[in-house]
Amino acid sequence: ILPITPAFQEEEKYDTFLLKNGYCGAFLMGLALHDSWIKQLENTTMPTVLFDNFISGNPNVCYLGTDSYEGITMAVNHLVNLGHKNIAFLNGSLYSLVSDQRQEAFESAMAAASLPVQKDLTAYGYYVSDSAKYHVPGFLSAGATAVVCGNDLIAKGVIDECTKRGFRVPEDVSVVGFDDISIAATFDPPLTTIRQERNELGRCAYDILNSLIHHIPISKTLLRPKLIERESTARCAHRD
């Protein structure tokens, strides 16, 4: 397991790095769309499983992930079914394939429910809980009764910021996370979230990489998400 920074990617070519270190393949995660290695993966000859990013037309690279589009659609539909109309979205990072997919899913799910996507109710949280303090005040001022979050850490920050400002979760504001990390059930209140099956992702990554090493091309594998209903969502109180 090796951390690969943007600066390192500029200094070291992807194929060269793997070959000189004796690696026969790699599982890559956390790359942004503008990262140097993403471009290089279009032509790599090294078996590569790419988590949450997609490279088309290269049989040596497979895109593995959870269906983010379906996951965000589940989250929005859950809130709509609870009567929420002013739904905010605190997404992940800019320049991310997954964030782009989730933004598209959020807008489509809202449109399907005949609900507008308000510009002041969408923002990027870069997957850190601290981001909530910069965006939640604006969401609350704009009348949000629910917040869909790019991951569970953002959701924890949203809950904390709502509580700090005198808004109860879920009585005043419902919050939905994404991932279902191990501590999500211990949040106060326990977090309603979209589960990614991490163990299954790991098993799939190994199996796919083994297939690629043996020249069996697999272009894309998406796992199904699951809505985990806990106590951070409730029927809308129709707060103005």
Language model features: what each stretch is:
Residues 2-11, 64-74, 90-135, 148-156, ...:
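Hinge/beta->alpha junction and helix N-cap segments in small-molecule ligand-binding domains
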